[in-house]
Amino acid sequence: MIHQITRAGKSLLAAGCTLSILFASDSYAATALNVSQQPLFLTQGVAPNLLFTLDDSGSMAWAYVPDGISGNSGRAGRSSDYNALYYNPDYAYQVPKKLTLSGDQIIVSDYPVPRFTAAWQDGYAQGSTTNLSNNYRPQWGTGWLGCIDSSCNTGRAYYYTYKVSASCPAQPVSSSNSCYTYNALPTSQESNFAIWYSYYRNRILATKTAANLAFYSLPENVRLTWGALNTCSIGANSRSCQNNALLQFNKQHKINFFNWLANSPASGGTPLHAALDRAGRFLQTNGTAYTTEDGKTYSCRASYHIMMTDGIWNGRNVTPGNLDNQNQTFPDSTLYRPQPPYADSNASSLADLAFKYWTTDLRPSIDNDLKPFMAYKSGDDSKDYWDPRNNPATWQHMVNFTVGLGLSYSLTLNSAPTWTGSTFGNYEELMAGSKAWPSVDNDAAPGNVYDLWHAAINSRGDFFSAESPDSLVQAFNKILTRISERNTSSSKPAMTSALQDDGTGDKLIRYSYQSSFASDKNWAGDLIRYKVESTSTGSTKTQEWSAGALLDNRAPATRNIYIASNSGTNRLKPFTWSNIEGSQLATWLNRNPDKDNQADTKGAQRVDFIRGQQNMDGFRQRQAVLGDIVHSSPAVVGPAQYLTYLANPIEPSGDYGTFKTEADQRSPRVYVGSNDGMLHGFNIKTGVEEFAFIPTAVFEKLNKLTGISYQGGAHQYFVDATPVVSDAFFDGAWHTVLIGTLGAGGRGLFALDVTKPDDVKLLWEYDSSTDSDLGYTFSKPTVARLHSGQWAVVTGNGYGSDNDKAALLLIDLKKGTLIKKLEVQSERGIANGLSTPRLADNNSDGIADYAYAGDLQGNIWRFDLIGNTRNDDPDTNTSINPFKPGDVDPSAFRVSFSGAPLFRARADNNTRQPITAPPTLVRHPSRKGYIVIVGTGKYFEDDDAQADTSRAMTLYGIWDRQTKGESANSTPTIDRNALTAQTMTTEANSTFGSVNRNIRLISQNPVKWYKDGATGTANSDVASYGWRLNLEVNSSKKGEMMIEDMFAAGQVLLLQTLTPNDDPCDSGSTSWTYGLNPYTGGRTSFTVFDLKRAGIVDSGSDYNGSVVSAFQQDGLGGLAITQNEQRQSEACTGDECIIFNPSDKSNGRQTWRVVEEK
């Protein structure tokens, strides 16, 4: 629909405003273009080092945990309530994975399920067997036990359960056999018991299986070496260690690891110091730790050590001293003074050794380019540095993840830090240092167990205390999740807010819906709802649900996934094999993507996979059901969008008030596109997926999702664009309609009626089979009322159409038929396509009058949607000759200025500057016409990942003077020489309060609109037609571009730029957030951003007395504009919200609100 914009100093919904715009967003692609099917901002990356140490001590052969119950092998020892290693009838034991190599392809299968009458005593060796039906004897230490009760003399497998009673306390005890009830194993549990017996019965078997199940899905880009406490040294590359050199975890090296793991023995002591020291020295001395097979050295390679043990360390033969209790200077020049939770009074503990290999630059000869892991941000950089949950180290160092099996019983000292089940569960107590780490020594309990925990903290890792096979699997999985590549997304968050009564009836509660993906997790995606609350130093986010986690735990058959149908009132049918068998879609799904789409008969299985079935043989092994969400921002559908008094005049025959009353009561949804082939609709309160739709335009490549090769370079985009939601009128009633596009996923768009969230209807689909001029649908549509009377979807045709044309498409909202196509002139031989349009309502009557859009050839086009000559006067907002909807025939719609562009964007070297972001409009300060603001840049082809430093991209503000509805047959010749130039004068690093930032200063050159002595306002009187700002600092061209939406908020133009970076030791791109004067393109006269996160914008955020116009800010996908609880304006990325001032009089609480982008 239509939204108003402001002149300087007015509210964004000011009563006297005479210009309205219909918002929309980006676009991309073309047949002559090489449209990337992977996120361009993902560099190949540098594979991390992972060192794995297994405890192979003699106690690993024992069949009980913890050590302290060694004398309690009676009934308690044969109950999982007391001995967590014993068979648990409530747990479904999983067989481990077996990996074999076929050519270059890893084949993953399951180890066989043992027979109950012949279960292997070691499921990996598969030698001796036991008949569990008549010859079962429990294992305790390294030997076997006989039966206790006469009821088990038959020798059938059995277990005991503990029952709480007046004489049997809640905590299971071993002293009273009467508290335990004997259970002969029922027939239904025979297979489960046999799996436990062969693969989990004792510590070494349980550890092997837990590691097996975690490591089989470890990303192949990780580099792995392994070792044990007694029998194998890390990095030895010996045959006895199965050739354990530090290599990428793929092909034969992966097979070697699993073979070594399966054959690891259990004998010897527990020399953890020597093992940790070996790992650290390997990273410090072995040349392969930071080089690749091609000999390149990378300074950003992270290194992690996983050390698993079941016991209390002994054999302390490494004595580093009491390092964590000594003053020292870290490699980044940070001064360390002993402080909690790092320091203690113990000398040469595991914690000291871990501290040594974290604080020491293990390779001082190479640069310190490791990326800090700062998951917890308080707004105080110094506090965040010392937060043990973060890892600020940029130098080469080792992070330890320690795992203790059956050791939680030792973590109970009242005088020591309180163990609550996780490393930082008692975070406040740890940071306060109110309880000291206990003393340690050889075989000392419980101090040596606390030392494992302390060692993880001192190296910025994690400690896991596992008591059962299940918790051991979870521990390994959590470690590998932490090590894996950070999740990221190229979409901005959806921000919603609501007033909540806090006693004053005036507390604004905000929610953020943040999408993400993880390429290293086989393209897993997620959508998370956060509650966002402001603090004195910024804002905090509290997760309320994860849609990805909820989908992983949902039965595929219960999902509501639909495709188009030619029948039925909703024109939708469930996506099941029975509904598509015999169709063209079934033919496409009966193709093997790993064998050049050869026909097979697995279409039904592929349907099951797409619906969410996991662990299917021969198909891709995903780590999550929800696919990657890269460029699609969430769209929230809740109450009605508009005020009744504004909506009713647009459709006098409709009753928006009644519609609004009903819509305000509907169950809210959040919709987002994903590259699993679907548009998803989630319940906004619970995160449960309520609806999903697979567009017809992606049918042909759905089978690719199942391919084993998909993890590599075979990734595809599917529904990779932001849905647009708008209220509109048709069929005699108001509706809420969602328009979906595909981005790089395909050449199509679709419309869904989402008025009733539990009764979604498909209105239509429009794709390249209907219109060959439709390219990849990067252009974000706008829903608008036209002067012809129709409600329409107005969109650019995108890139990659059959003829590489550029055109504005007007599609009937109800029918999906083409109302009008306005094709623009394109230079032949150069790919073209129209980007996202911005629509303008000239007199605020709710009907679109103009559309502005750029194209790939660097032209800015205006489209007249008014018809014949109109005589509105926007300066006074007086409609002299109003038009009613339906007065204009669509044939009167045309390209303005007789088919000529308003402006041609050319760089200083006269090369074309592509325009892929939508324009933004502001009222010209003279009240004559509008300033059309555009930025240049392109970021969707594979080559765009390489920064173009041959020229600078530019921000432009172009004065369109002919906007009164008059015939505009020509426009003045405007080139960059007719524009006032602004420049970036300074780029610097500075600290604001306690926050360190990279910032930029920009010139403040005045724009002289009219010539000196001019007495009129004719074109001949004009001195400048606008402004321009090259995206370069001191003529240094780094490839910075503008590809996202801009926002004109009051007297500030807000935008985010992107600079590609293909250095594997750097992020794939960097982003800068700008706050400019929209009327000059230069520096504002007032401070814009709260750079110091103080909760107020003042001169403390200036640099050397000058207003900062830009700062480097993490997060991709552009900005979301919102307000915090104090009604202060905030610009948000996925990573940070920062307060900004929209005008020189708007510091503090705001009385205006930001209009959401449409």
From Swiss-Prot:
GO terms for cellular component: cytosol; membrane; pilus. It is found in: Fimbrium; Membrane; Cytoplasm, Cytosol. Keywords: Calcium, Cytoplasm, Fimbrium, Fimbrium biogenesis, Membrane, Metal-binding, Pharmaceutical, Signal. Ca(2+) binds at residues 841, 843, 845, 847, 849. Disruption phenotype: Loss of twitching motility, predesposes to autolysis and impairs the secretion of quinolones and pyocyanine, but on the other hand promotes growth in stationary phase and bacterial survival in murine airway infection models. Has reduced congo red (CR) binding which is a measure of Pel exopolysaccharide (EPS) production, and shows both increased swarming motility and an altered swarming pattern compared to wild-type. One of its GO terms (molecular function) is calcium ion binding. Residues 1-29 form the signal peptide. Involved in pilus assembly, twitching motility and adhesion to host cells. Primes type IV pili (T4P) assembly and is required for inclusion of minor pilins PilV, PilW and PilX to the surface pili. Stabilizes assembled pilus fibers likely by antagonizing retraction mediated by PilT. Calcium-binding and calcium release by PilY1 seem to be essential for twitching motility and for regulation of pilus retraction dynamics of PilT. Regulates surface-activated virulence possibly by acting as a surface-attachment mechanosensor. This is Type IV pilus biogenesis factor PilY1. It comes from Pseudomonas aeruginosa (strain UCBPP-PA14).
